[in-house]
Curated annotation (Swiss-Prot):
One of its GO terms (cellular component) is extracellular region. Monomer. It comes from Drosophila teissieri (Fruit fly). Its EC number is 3.2.1.1. The gene is Amyrel. The lineage of its organism: Eukaryota, Metazoa, Ecdysozoa, Arthropoda, Hexapoda. Belongs to the glycosyl hydrolase 13 family. It is an enzyme of class 3 (hydrolase). This is Alpha-amylase-related protein. Keywords: Calcium, Carbohydrate metabolism, Chloride, Disulfide bond, Glycosidase, Hydrolase, Metal-binding, Pyrrolidone carboxylic acid, Secreted, Signal.
Length: 493
């Protein structure tokens, strides 16, 4: 009997963790966008007017629970929680619930960035949060939950990143480190996440997951409610989990400890794709992209060119400030069948602490748009760049096909097909790509969705005529505005 019970327990745990890799997308949609620091009302409108019609699968939203108010309102104040009340600069609980409902109604899922590792760092005396709650972070007193000092690990600094104890039980940049092995802490975290599930979210990005023991997270995840069927989720659906685990391959705490609990953020993907498109590694080597580069299995990897943290760091990672290379890297990211894809939607920044666009009263301002639909007034909105949203459509059109017909020039010009549904070519050399290439597409004329769109039966940008053998003449000049060309069956004239 004991063996049978143990077997059933293990099977249940295994099935739950497998289910937590499912992002619950509608139809053929398969790209998440991180609308960093957007207000809930603006996200709701964006789901209805842009993301839904353009085929985006979901939105990662900024932390939803009450945080400290820091001088100047830097973005990182959202990562310093003081209670689980759903009031932030993005809006209140009613506005959040309205956003989730409206986005789900148009097939765009919501994934919340959640903070399970810690509460706010040191601030002297009593602080007041975004919902009006008082706390004394230095004393580890958070009555809005409530948490007291006994709910936290003893205060210590992380000085040795090769010491598992320090990484998982000391304070990450001074943030008060919760004890997730505590029954009380577990109950409050589960209560918080279950409330979000009740409101209709599809899952969670778990911040700082490597700083929590995987067995504690497994307990928390397995204790969560199923997703809310009133928001269109099938019965017994589990929340999608993707966990922030920074692992460069030599970490004491490994991504492998978390990959069976849910997807894991594949930071090596971000670093290597940046290296390649900055010219530090020839694009020809991308033919083996994915597990051949030491990355996680595709279904366990949350992939991205940049995120809200590493886009602010020096190094190989690309961001919106290198637009030509960034668009090429994003096109490759969305065209190559590896990982669970997320694209970034940023605001402009000059330094690490730059706050989101705000008014004189330090309230986040809504994005405004020009006549082409691009964002202005401090918002970058990469997801509204044609070269990026068109590749979201490309990724939808070619879903469930494999890479075929790889070609390269032995250097930084490459092309490949996605079955007989799509074709991508990239030129990252300082000379033109001019070549008859196998597009693998049926005979016909196709619009390049990077340089333009298919509107009323004609192309506003480049077009390529494909012959009966699937070949077409591909030209990408070294001085072209974009170094990439993309064709797919849904953009056939």
């Amino acid at each position: 009997m004991f063996k049978l019970a143990l077997t059933l327990t293990l099977c249940l745990a295994g099935s739950l963790s497998l289910a937590q890799h499912n992002p619950h997308w509608w139809g053929n949609r398969n790209t998440i966008v991180h609308l960093f620091e957007w207000k809930w009302s603006d996200i709701a409108q964006e789901c209805e007017s842009f993301l839904g019609p353009r085929g985006f699968a979901g939105v990662q939203v900024s932390p939803v629970n009450e945080n400290i108010i820091a001088a100047g309102r830097p973005w990182w104040e959202r990562y310093q929680p003081i209670s689980y009340k759903l009031t932030t600069r993005s809006g209140n609980e009613e506005e959040f619930g309205d956003m989730v409902r409206r986005c789900n109604d148009v097939g765009v899922r919501i994934y919340v960035d959640v903070l399970l590792n810690h509460m706010s760092g040191d601030f002297d005396g009593v602080v007041v949060g975004t919902a009006g709650t008082e706390a004394e972070p230095r004393e580890k007193s958070f009555p809005g939950v409530p948490y007291t000092a006994q709910d936290f690990h003893p205060t210590c600094e992380i000085t040795d990143w090769n010491d598992r104890f320090q990484v998982q039980q000391c304070e990450l940049v001074g943030l008060k480190d919760l004890d997730q092995s505590s029954d009380w802490v577990r109950s409050k975290l589960i209560e918080f996440l279950d409330h979000l599930i009740e409101l209709g979210v599809a899952g969670f990005r778990v911040d700082a997951a490597k700083h929590m023991a995987s067995e504690d997270l497994e307990y928390i995840y397995s204790s969560l409610s199923n997703l809310n069927i009133d928001h269109g989720f099938p019965h017994n659906s589990r929340p999608f989990i993707f966990q922030e685990v920074i692992d460069h391959g030599h970490e004491t705490v490994s991504r492998d400890e978390y990959k069976d609990l849910g997807a894991v953020t594949e930071f090596r993907f971000s670093e290597e794709i940046g290296n390649a498109f900055r010219g530090n590694n020839a694009l020809k080597w991308l033919q083996s992209w994915g597990t051949g580069w030491g990355f996680l299995p595709s279904g366990q990897a949350l992939t991205f060119v940049d995120n809200h943290d590493n886009q602010r760091d020096a190094g190989a990672v690309l961001n919106y400030k290198s637009p030509k290379q960034y668009k090429m890297a994003t096109a490759f990211h969305l065209a190559y069948p590896y990982g669970i894809s997320r694209v970034m939607s940023s605001f402009a920044f000059d330094d690490h602490d730059t706050p989101p666009p705000q008014d004189a009263q330090e309230r986040i301002v809504s994005p405004e748009f020009d006549e082409d639909g691009a964002c202005v007034n401090g918002w970058i909105c990469e997801h509204r760049w044609r070269q990026i949203y068109a590749m979201v459509g490309f990724k939808n059109a070619v879903r469930d096909t494999e890479v075929t017909g790889w070609w390269d020039n032995g250097d930084n010009q490459i092309s490949f097909c996605r079955g007989n549904k799509g074709f991508l070519a990239i030129n990252n050399n300082l000379y033109d790509l001019s070549q008859d290439l196998n597009t693998c597409l049926p005979e016909g004329t196709y619009c390049d969705v990077i340089s333009g769109s298919l509107i009323d039966g004609s192309c506003t940008g480049k077009s390529v005529t494909v012959n009966e053998y699937g070949f077409g003449y591909i030209h990408i000049g070294s001085d072209d505005f974009d170094g990439v060309l993309a064709l797919h069956v849904d953009a056939r004239v």
